[in-house]
Every structure is written in C-alpha cells, then in structure tokens.
C-alpha cells in the first residue's frame, strides 16, 4: 500500500468519535436508530458515534435518567483492526490499526503499536512497547525488541518504507530510520540507531549503527527464535 492511497483514505474518510454510553431510565422501546443498544428495560449500553449518542440523549432526556459516556478516540480517521481475522497471538493492550497484515504464528505483545499499511511476517514477534510505523515491512521469523521503533513513512509520501528481511533480531530500544533496509539473518544491537542499510549476515551496533562483526554460530545461539512461543 503506497502513501498516497493511505493519505487519500484518511482525507476522504468520515471522521468519527467512537463512544460507549451507559444509560439508565425507562428504556423499553427506546429508538436508537443506527446506534447499537445492548441492555434491558432500565439499564443498557449504547455504542456508536459521540454526536449521535449526544443527539439521542437530548431527544430522549425524559426517559434517560442517568448516563455516562466513555470516549475512545476523537475525530478518528480510521478504525482499529478486527483482531479476529489474524492467525496470530495478540496480547492485551496491543494497538493495531486497520489495513495491517500479520502473518500466521506472529506474536504481538502488550503495548505494541502497529500503524496502517505495515506488514508483519509469519512467526515474527513484536515485543512490548515496540512501535511499527506506517508501511513498514517486517519479514518472517524476526524479533523486534521491547521499545524498538521502526519508522513509518506516510508523511512525506515520497519516503521509502523500512524493510526488515527474514530472520532479523532488533534489540530493545533500537531505532530503524526511514528508508533503511535490514538484510536477512542480521542483528541490530539494543539501543542502536540505524541510519543506513544493514548488510545480510551482519551485526550492527552504536549511534549511528555500524557493522561490528559477522553473524556467526555464537550470534545464532544467542538470538535463536523459540517456536514454542509462536504455537497457537
């Protein structure tokens, strides 16, 4: 998905303020229109857009004796993803926007954020509080460490997305800048800031990141992917 398509979708979308409203009162036969109502005669939950809920409460104020509204976003352009479509392990607190691809057996940990247009390969783990920016492409059997940032490239639209090839480990709190390609079977050390392409089969570290060694048997042992964590 290119940046221009995403930008047009955001521009043209009807901005919404999704909300959940808890209501009490004489609710039997309450006409909620396009809003979703779940409840009984004297208590229920209304789910929908904030403005529509406000209008309903104003219209039915004599019947609704009490209410509380929880706002989930404000003028949001795009919804969150439907998590049921993924054959992956997605833990509570992960935030995944719509139009994200996630491969079978991937693991998305608590607090991870994945933006629109990103692609997560099969068996890849996105660890706690990692941020995967828009249009970033991450291959199969990778591990993106806790707090790592893979830069997104929706703005400016001409920017090239980050590409991380298969079997790559990105250490905790590392940063991969826009347009960088990380070659297969490589390691980005914790805290590194990657500003240039990483050759396949290498280990990079530092700020800015530089090649410090080749990927060898010792490195392979220390960065081994555990398949049991990816079983569904």
From Swiss-Prot:
Keywords: Acyltransferase, Amino-acid biosynthesis, Diaminopimelate biosynthesis, Lysine biosynthesis, Repeat, Transferase. Pathway: Amino-acid biosynthesis; L-lysine biosynthesis via DAP pathway; LL-2,6-diaminopimelate from (S)-tetrahydrodipicolinate (acetylase route): step 1/3. One of its GO terms (biological process) is lysine biosynthetic process via diaminopimelate. Gene3D superfamilies: Hexapeptide repeat proteins, Malonyl-CoA ACP transacylase, ACP-binding. Its EC number is 2.3.1.89. The keyword Amino-acid biosynthesis applies. GO terms for molecular function: tetrahydrodipicolinate N-acetyltransferase activity. It holds the Pfam family DapH_N. It catalyses: (S)-2,3,4,5-tetrahydrodipicolinate + acetyl-CoA + H2O = L-2-acetamido-6-oxoheptanedioate + CoA. It is an enzyme of class 2 (transferase). CDD domains: LbH_THP_succinylT. Belongs to the transferase hexapeptide repeat family. DapH subfamily. Catalyzes the transfer of an acetyl group from acetyl-CoA to tetrahydrodipicolinate. This is 2,3,4,5-tetrahydropyridine-2,6-dicarboxylate N-acetyltransferase.
